[in-house]
Structure formats: C-alpha cells, structure tokens
A protein has these predicted regions:
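One-carbon transfer enzymes
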Residues: 1-206
Length: 206
C-alpha cells in the first residue's frame, strides 16, 4: 500500500535545498513522503528546471501585481490540486500570512541558516545571517529546521546541526559550509521525520 505523504516544496531561486531533497528521495533518506509539487514565486527560478529534470510537477505563483490574499490563494489552489500534506520552504522569499500558516498547523517546515534562537527573526535571511554571526564573533553556527508559525523563525524546532566557524571565513564561505554541512543534511532528515509521524498517525486511523 502506497500511503506516502504528499510533499510540496516552495522555492524562489536556484533550488540547492530542493536538490538536496530530490537527492534524498532518490537515495532512500526520504521514504515516508514524496515530492509531488514544486511551487515557485519566480518564473525564472532555476529550481523549476531541477524539478522538471526530476519529473516533478511545477507551478508558478508570482506575487507581482496582485494582493497577498490572491497570491496565497493561487498557492493554495496548486497545493489542494495535488492533495499536499506537508510544505517545505526551500529558499522561498515570500512571507506567508498567519491565515495561510493556520491551514497547515505543524505541516510547514523551513530551514534557517543559524542555530535558533541566535541570528533569526525579521531581517535575518541569506548572507545577512552569516555576516551577523561573523560580526558577533561566535565560534559555532549552523542550521535549524523548524515548523513555521505566524512568528518569523518562531515555530517549534525539529532539528539542528552545528557548524564550526573558521578564522578567515567570509559570509560567502560560511554560507557554503553551513549549506553543505548542515542544511542539506538536516532538511531532508527533518522532512522524513515529519512525514513519518504523519504517516504513522494515518495508519493508526485505518
């Protein structure tokens, strides 16, 4: 019986975290869920090509020229069509409203490039996070996968992985190390953990 949990990945750019998820699905790290849909807020995102190469359905929902409500409705329509149960934010650059998040309680996960509660919340994204860590002088940083709620980076933590900061690090070098040594490892592992728990709950009801 194939009762895998349907996953959608929301993207805006190059899709390196999406690729990590696709690779994890191929290699058997993600077995309880299946990526059924990739939704991009940018029609030119290379992530769409990655999805296409992996034979995954795609949808483009651009924010430009429409209200937040219309933008979110277009995403919800795409998700509902594929009966999506878990949403993974992988470099998705749009903020989702509290109303949207409430529709998927503890079903939306995000990866943040620091050890929350450090260097997180409003204004902390991309290279800014790594610059802040270097400016502060911390010796260890990392990545966190957490559930998404209405507070930026405020949802319950699912997994964390630490990464050492080296003496001559720049924000760019540190970003690459955190991606390779933390984000690409814990995002697929956390997606599997969440899907496995949902699958077990579904099986209990059968």
């Amino acid at each position: 019986m194939n009762n895998k949990v349907n996953i959608a990945v929301l993207v805006s750019g190059g899709g390196t975290n999406l690729q990590a998820l696709i690779n994890a699905q191929k290699s058997g790290i993600i077995t309880s869920g299946e990526i059924k849909l990739v939704v991009s807020s940018n029609k030119n995102a290379y992530a769409l090509k990655r999805a296409e190469n992996a034979g995954i359905k795609t949808a483009v929902c651009e924010r430009k020229g429409i209200s937040q409500k219309e933008f979110e409705e277009s995403i919800l329509n795409a998700l509902e069509k594929e009966k999506i149960e878990v949403i993974v934010l992988a470099g998705f650059m749009s903020i989702l409203s509290a109303d949207f998040v409430k529709r998927y309680p503890e079903r939306i996960i995000n990866v943040h490039p620091s050890l929350i509660p450090s260097f997180c919340g409003e204004g902390f994204y991309g290279l800014r996070v790594h610059k802040a860590a270097l400016d502060y002088g911390v010796k260890v940083t990392g990545a966190t996968v957490h559930f998404v709620n209405e507070i930026p980076d405020g949802g319950r933590i699912i997994m964390q992985k630490a990464v050492e900061i080296k003496e001559n690090d720049t924000p760019e070098i540190l970003q690459k190390r955190v991606m390779e040594n933390a984000e690409w490892i814990i995002l697929p592992a956390a997606a599997e953990k969440v899907c496995k728990e949902i699958k077990e709950r579904k099986n209990e009801r059968i």
